[in-house]
Design a protein with these regions (language model features):
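Structural signature of extracellular appendage/secretion-system components
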Residues: 1-199
Length: 199
């Protein structure tokens, strides 16, 4: 009797067979996922678990690379009321949450995206806070953020970080000193930025 199984379930048994199909996800598993990634489903309605320990071969390898997040999910951080937590520039904050059910502990694309996003978020927040605390070279106004999100986005990620267009147009808006009493040539804000390297 000729038999082919996949994930512990029968695909072909003699002349009988079960069909599989793909369906785009309505919701993202990780906040940084591409929209409408595909899930595999049995046409019979039976559950096809992409994250089952019994899944192997090329399909498992592809799922691990596409969905591998080291047992974590990247999601938007919320407070006890369910409201989004925002950074000092008003961007939604991402966090990684450990959830092993229906998941893979392989370090695939989502894992490295999450690590990059965390680095970018920390870097941009630290640099922006230093610059916003300082004054422009003429001492008349506070500095503005160096890093912002691209238009029509509300979360600082490796994909959408950009240099503030206001600074591209007018570099005089960049903070260079910590107070009006500091001389123009001192540029002590740059020293504060340099110290971030060791923090």
């Amino acid at each position: 009797d000729f038999r082919v199984s996949i994930n512990g379930q029968t695909l072909v048994a003699g002349y009988d067979y079960n069909k599989l199909y793909t369906e785009a996800r309505a919701d993202k598993r990780n906040a940084s996922d591409a929209a409408a990634l595909y899930d595999v489903k049995w046409e019979s309605g039976q559950n096809f678990n992409l994250y089952s320990p019994s899944l192997g071969g090329q399909m498992k390898a592809l799922v691990d690379i596409r969905d591998g997040c080291n047992g974590e999910f990247e999601q938007y951080k919320v407070d006890e009321n369910g409201d989004y937590i925002l950074d000092s520039d008003g961007n939604k904050v991402l966090e990684s949450v450990l959830r092993n059910e229906q998941n893979t502990d392989f370090k695939g694309i989502p894992y490295y995206q999450s690590q990059l996003n965390q680095f970018i978020s920390t870097l941009s927040e630290s640099v922006n806070n230093v610059l916003k605390s300082g004054l422009t070279s003429d001492g008349t106004q506070h500095g503005i953020s160096l890093f912002v999100t691209q238009t029509n986005t509300d979360t600082m990620t490796a994909l959408n970080i950009t240099v503030n267009p206001e600074l591209v147009k007018d570099a005089d808006k960049l903070a260079t000193r910590s107070s009006a009493a500091t001389g123009q040539a001192e540029a002590d804000i740059m020293e504060q930025l340099r110290k971030l390297q060791s923090e």
